[in-house]
Each structure stands twice: as C-alpha cells, then as structure tokens.
Amino acid sequence: MKKILLAIGALVTAVIAIGIVFSHMILFIKKKTDEDIIKRETDNGHDVFESFEQMEKTAFVIPSAYGYDIKGYHVAPHDTPNTIIICHGVTMNVLNSLKYMHLFLDLGWNVLIYDHRRHGQSGGKTTSYGFYEKDDLNKVVSLLKNKTNHRGLIGIHGESMGAVTALLYAGAHCSDGADFYIADCPFACFDEQLAYRLRAEYRLPSWPLLPIADFFLKLRGGYRAREVSPLAVIDKIEKPVLFIHSKDDDYIPVSSTERLYEKKRGPKALYIAENGEHAMSYTKNRHTYRKTVQEFLDNMNDSTE
C-alpha cells in the first residue's frame, strides 16, 4: 500500500511539475530586448530607428479591459484618414513594426503601431497569443476611429502572433471591425502549433504533455490552446484578407496559411514568398512583398470610390 501511495504521489508531482513548467514557457515566453531587435533589424538592412526618433508622432496610452495600459504611437504625415494598424509578433515590440510602418508610409497610408500586452511599454502579466490581445486590438481600433471621426479606411497588418490577433479580432468583429486585413505567417490553431514546436524543438510527443500543460494554461492564464484558433473563425470574416507566408518557414509551416486561405470565404488573396524563414517574407522579398501589398491596397481604395 505504501508503494502504491508513493507511486501515486510521484505521478501527481510529475504531472504538476510538467504543467507548471510548460505553461510557464507559454505564458512567460522570453522576450527580445530592444538591443536584440535593433541589431537584428539593422543587420537585415532595416535602418529605420534614427528616423523614427526624429519623426513627428503622437504617443497614446489607452486602458485595456484587463487592467493594464496599452501604449503606442500614431504616425500621420499624410493628409488622409486612411490608416494601417500594425501588430507585432510574440517576443517583439514596436521596434519590429518600424520596417512595416515605413512600407505603408511610403505607400501613402498613415500608421498606428503599439505594443501588445506584456511586450514593450504595454502592461499585462502574461502572453496569450491572440486570446486577450484581440480585445486590446479592439480598443486600439476604437481609438483610431475616434481620432479619424470614423472617416477613411482602416487596415490591420499582423506578423506571426500579430497576424493571429488580427484574424481573431476580425472573426469577433465582422461588421464593426477594420476594413481589411493583412495576415503575415499566422498559425492556424495554437494547439497544433504547440504540438509542432514540441516535436521540432524537443522531440517530444504532444500527449500527455499538451493536455497537462493546457490544463495549467487554463488555470494560470485563463484560456485553453484550442481557444486560440484563427481556423475556427476564419469563415466568419467577410472583409478582404491578404495572406502572406514564406514557403520555407520552418517555425510556423506555410500549410497553416494555406488552410486559412482555403477556408476563408469572400474577398481574399494569397502571396507565398520564395525566400526567407519565419516572419522574414518582407525582409527577403522586398520588391514582390511591396508590389503585392500595393496591389491589395489599391483594390481597397478602388472599392470605396
């Protein structure tokens, strides 16, 4: 009997340890420092940081529904209400959004950039990969609509987790959201993405690790992995979506975007970049990326004339 109790105790201890460790890795994923991001972006030819410091911009702070502040910048040099909101990826911050900011500014659009919860200057204790972030994005969109007096077009560009956030937001705000979306390298389902990363990084099976981690994720973070699923809401999105992914992405497979594109009804476009790893489609394919985005934006402008 004593051996049985010891075995049960050891099993319970192991389950708790697994749950705490893996849920901690998800909720408190290590973030890049400003120095890391600046070095990476500069090494990749994005010399945008000094110009941002000198650029005229308006800082903003808005309260999240979850009790922290969301911080960002509105950059509006053009005489137009048309604006792109840029959502950065996990572990990043607004510094990673600057290359996209310059792309859209060059194309004649104003830009709003901000830090997701637990990233950059924004508050928040945990990362939820789009689950809570989509509601913060709703606050940002409302701020922008008030700034522009509900005039002009609003588009949302997201990279990686930012793309997931944009799609989850779009699925929840079909009639009162943005006018269009650009989703660059999103995952289709978070539980599938976690299973994929477990195999790729640790050579570990998803069972029983993921069910245990998922229980603790709900306990500690308030959400389950299956609740973070663009694929589950993509058929609700009526507004146009441009999907982007590099074919050689080995962090989030290109098949994720292909599945989302296939299931999306209504206006949509797909650009599979020839070069670049995860979240590097613009960096490694600047001309074709810009051309694809410009054509998509031109279609948005034409549809409102």
UniProtKB/Swiss-Prot annotation:
It comes from the Bacteria. It is found in: Membrane. Its main location: membrane. The keyword Acetylation does not apply. The keyword ATP-binding does not apply. InterPro entries: AB_hydrolase_fold (IPR029058), DNA-binding_regulatory (IPR052920), Hydrolase_4 (IPR022742). Keywords: Membrane, Transmembrane, Transmembrane helix. It is a single-pass membrane protein. GO terms for cellular component: membrane. The chain crosses the membrane at residues 8-28. SUPFAM superfamilies: alpha/beta-Hydrolases. PANTHER family: ALPHA/BETA-HYDROLASE (PTHR43358), EXPORTED PROTEIN (PTHR43358:SF5). This is Uncharacterized protein YqkD. It comes from Bacillus subtilis (strain 168).
